[in-house]
Amino acid sequence: MDILQSINDFNEAKQVIPGGVNSPVRAFGSVGGTPRFIAKGKGAYIYDEDDNEYIDFVQSWGPLIFGHANEVIESALSLAIKDGLSFGAPTEKETTLVKQIIALSGSAEKMRLVNSGTEATMSALRLARAYSNKDDIIKFEGCYHGHSDSLLVSAGSGCATFGTPSSPGVPNDITKHTLVARYNDIESVRACFEQSKNVACVIIEALAGNMGFVPADKKFMQDLRALCDEYNALLIIDEVMSGFRAGLKGAIGLYDVQADLVTYGKVIGGGMPLAAFGGRADIMDMLSPVGGVYQAGTLSGNPIAVSAGLATLLQIKANPTLYEHLEVLAKRLIKGLKEAAQSYEIPLQVDCRGSMFGFFFNQKEVKNFDDAKCSDTAMFARFHQKMLDKGVYFACSQFETGFICSAMNEMIIDEVIMKAKAVFGEITHEIESRI
């Protein structure tokens, strides 16, 4: 595969952009090789600057549930742009979008739009601390909630890729208010509550997507809700990745556990910079200008991003079999990958919910970040490189999640499985030839 233009682009980018990328995982640091510089996408496929075609399971890290260059979204954007790019004033579309999110998800009474998942979780934490008049928070090792200082502690993919638990530049005076519990371990959460009597909230990805794909156990989520009530702490469920990905009602719908506050992003923006946080009205009404908790943004509720979000949600609403179709494809993919690996006695753990999936080169089921870290990342890197050379674009880290889009079909999935089986065969042959 010729990737000369990507090599040249990457070298040029590194001269003016730190690491050559604007988000670290894109640099292929954990899998090796040269990141592909993408020129365009259509449906299930992306094309690099050398015009190589790839089946794309990254889908912009989750937002593109209908695939690349969706015509309905493109049309909505084209119309919106003609009316102006940004006003810094309220628009009817903002209210319409928020109503759609609330009605479809059933997860909040009121909601505010922001520009990124990091903004959403950061704002939700500030609000929870103000509401409870407490300072400490509990998060889970391996869960990623953006790069705000309070949450950049044991943060999964963004840090796990580089083997560091946090980041330089994050003051201890801030992180001392963050307690870290073990995912799927309710007793570790209780221990955090016993350690601090000043816990404002617990924040969690019910479907963890940044330690690889690791779903929470249903009983764990139910016990977590009860524990938050017992200790008078708010429960924040981070649906930035899983919202409208795992199903119409996201992870909250799968677990039947109500959050006090919830965050959204990715799908609700349809590929544009858009996120949201919401929850009970009595909590949300503490936000300025109604209450005293300050939160603001020049481009919050940007009409172009809102138009893309509306076009996405209205398509979801009009397609009642969407999530069933996506999950059928996801299950077909992970079943095929596991069987392909087994045929060469390569251990592979797989799982999916809705259109989210993941796999680990691991001997045992992965239930938390400790389990995930025991995975064979060298094997993942070899697999990733070889699949990329065969035109399959998986997430470039063992500690990330994959995504199915509606533009995919059984033929595409079967093609990927066939290529994976060939790759497992190549890897096995290479290993045996060295013995």
Curated annotation (Swiss-Prot):
PROSITE patterns: AA_TRANSFER_CLASS_3. Pfam families: Aminotran_3. Its EC number is 5.4.3.8. Signal peptide: none annotated. Its main location: cytoplasm. The modification N6-(pyridoxal phosphate)lysine is found at residue 266. It is found in: Cytoplasm. Belongs to the class-III pyridoxal-phosphate-dependent aminotransferase family. HemL subfamily. Homodimer. This is Glutamate-1-semialdehyde 2,1-aminomutase. It comes from Helicobacter hepaticus (strain ATCC 51449 / 3B1). The gene is hemL.
